[in-house]
């Protein structure tokens, strides 16, 4: 237990037990950004694996869905990272994962991810799409390079080395 005294207020914080962790320790960087919407009949983001969790309800076809994207890096045992993209649906009961995909372009590089940043930090974006930058090294001694992840209004994903 940790105690902290702030301007006459005593605050006590207790560490949560390891088994109650909300975010796995291997997730080293994450950002939630962008916006998507569909009529409920559209497929989830391109390249989604067959085992992706889906929030589409076949009995309620045509139900409008919308949400945002989450881009995150997961450290691997060899200290490199895999980068994943999630499509998060805003539902009546709160956020729900619509799909999760591994961005193979990053996995092929076996990168050391040093940061992930959204295009801006202004909060909710109402134009469909996503733009974020993943900073990575392919050699641990090198300087990081920026790689952009772009999702257009049609849901097509582009991953490419950033240009200055």
Range-by-range predicted roles:
Residues 1, 14-15:
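N-terminal leader/presequence regions that precede the main folded/catalytic core
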Residues 8-9, 164:
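Intrinsically disordered, low-complexity linkers and terminal tails enriched in Pro/Gly
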Residues 1-8:
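Bacterial N-terminal signal peptides
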Residues 15-164:
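Exposed acidic/polar residues on beta-strands and adjacent loops within beta-sheet cores, strongest
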